[in-house]
């Protein structure tokens, strides 16, 4: 009888110990996500010697990869760069490549490799909107996204919102992705046109339309201001890698 009681007591102690282990493991699991985000900030500081970039007091360590957040950043750079090149062409009469050569003292032949790489990167980033799925964190959201022309060939320009992946006018991040992709394509093709013709984006536009810069000045100013505002406006909405922030 004493043996039986001691056996039961030992078994109860074992069960209690296992429960405590499970509780400790569960508590550790719940704490891990907070530690992970802190570790990312610390790793960024350790690798670069600089604090992680902060927006509204919240730190965002830079991550390499074709994510929507990075694509948004590249799109903003394209909008700012395209706008600046147009302003420079108005002031100097030279296109983006000629301005680059003037600033650096290099001629077009010496920067051919750089220009080709820049054009290729702009084209790839603009025409491969699904490339952000290379990041594992965004794989789970693919099924929740509405189909686009790459997934459903029945979607045509007759349905512009579905075709371009926008939901209407407004400074949302989804719409800004579209504007950024358009800026990347426009910048890339303007560089290709300048390499072929020797003329900047505005001069190419004049050749295509037969209109002088004086005739298109107002529309051009509105276009440049829109690109600049779209590039610096934070907009609304968030991406999958911001949901845990």
From Swiss-Prot:
It is a multi-pass membrane protein. The keyword Lipid biosynthesis does not apply. SUPFAM superfamilies: Chlorophyll a-b binding protein (SSF103511). Residues 1-25 form a transit peptide. The chain crosses the membrane at residues 72-92, 108-128, 185-205, 217-237. Keywords: Chloroplast, Membrane, Photosynthesis, Photosystem II, Plastid, Thylakoid, Transit peptide, Transmembrane, Transmembrane helix. Its main location: plastid. It is found in: Plastid, Chloroplast thylakoid membrane. Induction: Induced transiently by high light stress (at protein level). GO terms for biological process: nonphotochemical quenching; photosynthesis. Gene3D superfamilies: Chlorophyll a/b binding protein domain (1.10.3460.10). GO terms for cellular component: chloroplast thylakoid membrane; photosystem II. It comes from the Eukaryota. The keyword Transmembrane helix applies. Belongs to the ELIP/psbS family. Required for non-photochemical quenching (NPQ), a mechanism that converts and dissipates the harmful excess absorbed light energy into heat and protect the photosynthetic apparatus from photo-oxidative damage. Seems involved in the activation of NPQ, possibly by promoting conformational changes required for activation of LHCSR3-dependent quenching in the antenna of photosystem II (PSII). This is Photosystem II protein PSBS2. It comes from Chlamydomonas reinhardtii.
């Amino acid at each position: 009888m004493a043996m039986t009681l001691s056996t039961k007591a030992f078994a109860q102690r074992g069960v209690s110990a296992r429960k405590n282990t499970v509780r400790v493991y569960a508590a550790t699991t719940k704490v891990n996500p907070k530690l992970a985000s802190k570790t990312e900030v610390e790793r960024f500081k350790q690798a670069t010697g600089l604090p992680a970039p902060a927006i509204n007091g919240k730190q965002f360590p830079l991550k390499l990869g074709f994510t929507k957040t990075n694509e948004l950043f590249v799109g903003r750079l394209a909008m700012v760069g395209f706008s600046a090149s147009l302003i420079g062409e108005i002031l100097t009469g030279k296109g983006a490549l000629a301005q680059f050569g003037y600033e650096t003292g290099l001629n077009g032949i010496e920067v051919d490799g750089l220009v080709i790489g820049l054009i290729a990167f702009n084209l790839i980033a603009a025409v491969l909107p699904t490339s952000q799925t290379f990041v594992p964190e965004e794989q789970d959201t693919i099924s929740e996204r509405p189909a686009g022309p790459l997934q459903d060939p029945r979607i045509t320009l007759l349905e512009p919102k579905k075709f371009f992946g926008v939901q209407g006018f407004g400074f949302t991040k989804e719409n800004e992705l579209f504007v950024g992709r358009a800026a990347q394509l426009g910048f890339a093709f303007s560089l290709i046109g300048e390499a072929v013709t020797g003329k900047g984006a505005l001069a190419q536009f004049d050749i295509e339309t037969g209109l002088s810069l004086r005739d298109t000045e107002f529309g051009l100013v509105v276009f440049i201001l829109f690109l600049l505002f779209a590039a610096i406006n934070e907009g609304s909405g968030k991406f999958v890698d911001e949901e845990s922030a």
